[in-house]
Swiss-Prot record:
Belongs to the IF-3 family. GO terms for biological process: ribosome disassembly. It comes from the Bacteria. The gene is infC. One of its GO terms (cellular component) is cytosol. The keyword Protein biosynthesis applies. The lineage of its organism: Bacteria, Pseudomonadati, Campylobacterota, Epsilonproteobacteria, Nautiliales. This is Translation initiation factor IF-3. Monomer. It is found in: Cytoplasm. One of its GO terms (molecular function) is translation initiation factor activity. Keywords: Cytoplasm, Initiation factor, Protein biosynthesis.
Length: 177
């Protein structure tokens, strides 16, 4: 992983002879030589940071680089917090499952859906059961009416390798006014 995108040129690293200089308080210094911009930054006890290297002339800002970097990291952390991670719970079944076992597994699936988690039902096909994958589809179709009130079937029962899979997601709650 390269750090090229995170690399910011500051102070003596800036090689442009002239730069458009902006102060940390928004003060416009105009187009000045790099050395003059460095002097202004040094007088204020701050850093000269290259903001727009592709502009003509390049734009530099006089600021506290440590503080700037801290605020950038803080923004990234805040953005990560706002992302929601979807958790998928998997419930395994077999073709020869009894109705009371289906009810038990559906009870757990309902609990997961109430917590906002996605549920993946998998029917494992053993040996000769692979010749009749529709038996696995039938098992999953028995489950659909038992969870319709709380979940939505996102992916209908379909064969994937030795499994017949079905994905159920929680229903969106209508906002009460």
């Amino acid at each position: 992983m390269s750090k090229k995108k995170d690399q910011v040129l500051l102070n003596e690293q800036i090689d442009a002879p002239e730069v458009r200089c902006v102060g940390d308080d928004g003060t416009q210094y105009g187009i000045v030589s790099r050395d003059e911009a460095l002097k202004i930054a040094e007088q204020k006890g701050l850093d000269l940071v290259l903001i727009a290297p592709n502009a003509n002339p390049p734009v530099c800002k006089i600021m506290d680089y440590g503080k700037f970097k801290y605020q950038q990291e803080k923004k990234l952390k805040e953005a990560k917090k706002k992302q929601t991670k979807i958790e998928v719970k998997e419930i395994k079944l077999s073709v020869k499952i009894a109705q009371n076992d289906i009810d038990y597994k559906v009870k757990h699936a309902r609990e997961f859906l109430e917590k906002g988690k996605h549920v993946k039902f998998r029917v494992f096909l053993r040996g000769r059961e692979m010749a009749h994958p529709e038996a696995g589809v039938e098992v999953l179709e028995k489950i659909i009416p038992l969870i319709e009130d709380i979940g939505v079937v996102e992916k209908k029962p379909h064969l994937e390798g030795r499994y017949v899979n079905m994905l159920v997601i929680p229903k969106k709650e209508e906002k009460k006014k």
